[in-house]
Design a protein with these regions (language model features):
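N-terminal alpha-helical membrane-insertion module
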Residues: 7-11
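Bacterial Sec-dependent N-terminal signal peptides
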Residues: 1-4, 14-43
Length: 194
């Protein structure tokens, strides 16, 4: 019993010491905020530079990017940026881009003659649309975060079939094709349709 009390006192003393010697960091930088995207933009190209269409009214000029990050292609992208004090006469606020990552951006595909042809060409494998801030219709794009089963052996394809209902031109169908990839675990991806 004496040994137990001795070890209990030592353990309590060590815990008290650990709590009392903890340091307080006054490192108040917001570095962690740079690890997540803070905007979904359309990267638009004009001449030898690009700008970001943030929403229907807001454009941003990347101040620290001197070339077009995706060539001459207009794409949707997730971006993490920091505001600056500078202004651009044409594009509004100037931002510093911490990082940018493009989203698969593609056109809708035509509806084929029969549902069987659509199944064969575009697939009919399980896909879920995730309710998220990235799932949005803006700037002429339908941008989706979607969830599917992946095996990472073969590339999957994702398509938006247009004109599936002649009576309703706004009715579309999202199709996922695993292309024979084993469906092992759930994972998310992004796609934007123009």
């Amino acid at each position: 019993m004496k040994k137990f009390k001795k070890w209990a006192l030592v353990a309590i003393g060590m815990m008290t010491l650990a709590v009392s010697l903890g340091s307080c960091s006054d490192d108040d930088n917001d570095y962690y905020l740079r690890t997540v995207p803070n905007a979904l933009v359309t990267v638009k190209v004009t001449g030898d530079r690009c700008y970001f269409q943030l929403d229907d009214q807001t454009t941003l000029a990347p101040g620290n990017i001197s070339k077009k990050p995706f060539g001459d292609k207009e794409v949707r992208a997730l971006v993490n940026y920091t505001m600056t004090d500078r202004k651009d006469d044409k594009y509004g606020a100037v931002v510093n881009v911490n990082w940018i990552d493009s989203i698969l951006t593609k056109k809708p595909v035509p509806c084929l003659a029969t549902p069987e042809e659509n199944d064969a060409k575009y697939g009919h494998d399980a896909v879920d649309i995730v309710r998220d801030w990235v799932t949005i219709v803006e700037d002429g794009y339908l941008t989706l975060r979607f969830r599917a089963l992946w095996g990472n052996v073969k590339p999957h394809s994702i398509n938006l079939i247009a004109h599936v209902n002649p009576q309703n031109p706004y009715e579309v169908e999202l199709r996922h094709h695993t292309n024979g990839d084993p469906q092992l675990r759930w994972g998310d991806a992004f796609v934007a349709f123009d």
